[in-house]
């Protein structure tokens, strides 16, 4: 069964190491993704928040790398820009690649930059990484209670108008609830877990999970070890998060978001390991329909509802 993976940091790693997506030294490449049953992949553009011009240059280098890899590996990949791309028969044996921006420092406060990145192929965006920027507070700002700025609210409206998926991973708790108020389409939290099972700031509280469900959203359960369990995280611990969240808000709101190449410590070592997810979910009592929803159906629903 094909899988949608909602987050990997492979593009920035490829640029840093001057490596290829076909095969490389990281946690994710085409050869292993095919073994791992990946059908659709969100590829993050990410640069550590620094000088705005430095960030923009680095993000644009990653956009260029994305297009190079799509062109050089056209037998295996296609650029996913609309839902229809995901279901075309000629794409059935390829990986659909959706371009995502992790942290909007490259956008700044210029609304035209949102439209420009859309023209460059961007279809998903998180307003922040961990830090505060001109649009919102990130999760590392602690108890500042800072949410969205006025410009952040305007950016959300522009994203909705264009058809760009909103990702609320990394945003502050106040920003999370602000975003649900000002973005009028279903949202994603592309890589996070349940804070009730692992008390990490990047994980979602029960109230956040319930709010996500009320807005028709989807969370990508992630296998970064420190988000799964304080120490000694295993596959069973990862599956515990799936079970907890589906029990709390329903199976229709759960997917997977690996964060491959974003952390050295993973429950699943590399993307090949995704091949065990279907069987693992079955072992926890999920039926075939529910497994398909978790592995691809829920994420594809958001893509269908948001992308134009």
Summary of predicted features, one role per range:
Residues 46-48, 262, 295-301:
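A short, acidic, flexible beta-alpha connecting loop/helix-capping segment that sits on the rim
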Residues 42, 220, 254-257, 292-295:
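Conserved active-site loop/cleft motifs that coordinate metal ions or position small ligands
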Residues 1-218, 226, 243-246, 253, ...:
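Extended, charged catalytic domains and RNA/DNA-binding interfaces, predominantly
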Residues 223, 249-271:
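Short acidic/histidine-rich active-site segments
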Residues 24, 236, 268-272:
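Soluble non-cytosolic domains of exported or imported proteins
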Residues 228-234, 263-268:
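Short, glycine/charged-rich beta-strand-loop motifs at protein surfaces that mediate ligand recognition
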Residues 160, 269-308:
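Mid-to-C-terminal alpha-helical segments outside catalytic/metal-binding sites
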């Amino acid at each position: 069964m094909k899988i949608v993976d909602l987050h990997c940091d492979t593009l920035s790693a490829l640029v840093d190491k001057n490596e290829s997506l076909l095969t490389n030294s990281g946690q994710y490449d085409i050869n292993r993704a095919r073994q791992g049953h990946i059908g659709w992949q969100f590829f993050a553009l990410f640069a550590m928040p620094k000088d705005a011009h430095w960030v923009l240059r680095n993000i644009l280098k990653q956009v260029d790398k994305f297009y190079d890899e799509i062109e050089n590996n056209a037998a295996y990949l296609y650029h996913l820009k609309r839902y229809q791309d995901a279901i075309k028969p000629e794409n059935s044996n390829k990986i659909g690649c959706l371009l995502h921006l992790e942290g909007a420092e490259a956008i700044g406060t210029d609304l035209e930059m949102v439209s420009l990145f859309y023209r460059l192929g961007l279809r998903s965006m998180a307003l922040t990484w961990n830090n505060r920027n001109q649009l919102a507070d990130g999760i590392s700002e602690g108890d500042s209670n800072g949410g969205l700025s006025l410009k952040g609210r305007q950016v959300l409206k522009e994203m909705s108008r264009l058809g760009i998926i909103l990702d609320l991973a990394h945003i502050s708790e106040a920003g999370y609830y602000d975003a649900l108020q000002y973005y009028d389409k279903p949202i994603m939290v592309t890589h996070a877990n349940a804070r009730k099972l692992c008390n990490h700031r990047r994980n979602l509280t029960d109230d956040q999970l319930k709010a996500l469900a009320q807005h028709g959203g989807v969370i990508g359960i992630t296998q970064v070890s420190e988000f799964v369990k304080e120490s000694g995280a295993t596959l069973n611990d990862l599956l515990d998060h799936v079970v907890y969240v589906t029990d709390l808000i329903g199976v229709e709101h759960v997917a997977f978001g690996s964060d491959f190449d974003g952390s050295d410590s993973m429950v699943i070592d590399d993307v090949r390991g995704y091949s065990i997810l279907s069987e693992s979910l079955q072992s926890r009592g999920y039926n075939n329909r529910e497994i398909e929803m978790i592995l691809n159906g829920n994420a594809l629903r958001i893509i269908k509802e948001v992308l134009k």
